[in-house]
Amino acid sequence: MAKGCSYSLIGPNGSGKTTFIKCLLGTVIPDSGTLTLDGQSLLNNPALRARIGYMPQIGRYPDNMRVGQLFEMLNEIRTGTVDRRDEDLKDAFGISKIANKSMRTLSGGTRQRVSACIAFLFDPDVLVLDEPTAGLDPVSVEILKEKVMNEREKGKLILLTSHILSDLDEITTDVIFIIEGKLCFSRPIQELRAEGGEEKLGKLIARIMRDPQSVSLSQKPA
């Protein structure tokens, strides 16, 4: 995968998307193959993994902790390891206004906003966003999409998954499609649109699943 691109990882339920993400994050060790960042293996390399920002599908935090305390704790943990801070989303989402609220009182959408802020907080080189728009209101979705595009323009590598493919239309540069843990193809979205005759990502993927011959599925380096 190349820097300055946003890859949408797509596949049917059970295709291996979550497992792939867990391998990137180090919570699952792959049976074979090597995951590298800038030519270095991610295996047993916490310093390298610290350059990855992660937004989980469901953020789980201590219920009795206040929002402000959560960010204070994270900053203390990373003190001395990462000097850069990116608080654009914290400002855009108005996190300071809910700093004194406990995590247990937050709605699902507000938890998602907190998770998004944490993913970007330490200005990572790689962003892994798992169902990032789930539960967000329309305004928050647009704020997050704009942030993703801005970070991509800065040369960051972004990996996204979502069952709401319409949310990925504007921010996807490349599509990685997997089935049963195997890579079917990795292609620039504009190439797929030209070959498949569909502009909308959801319709394009549906067409590919119905008729794999509608586009070239030859594998290209991801």
Each predicted region: which residue ranges?
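Helix-to-loop junction immediately C-terminal to a conserved catalytic motif
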Residues: L25
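Conserved ABC transporter NBD signature motif
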Residues: G33-L48
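Conserved ABC ATPase "signature" region
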Residues: E72, D83-I98
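Conserved ABC ATPase signature
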Residues: S102-G109
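Hydrophobic anchor residue at the start of the ABC signature
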Residues: A116
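Catalytic Walker B motif of ABC-type/P-loop ATPase nucleotide-binding domains
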Residues: L127-E131
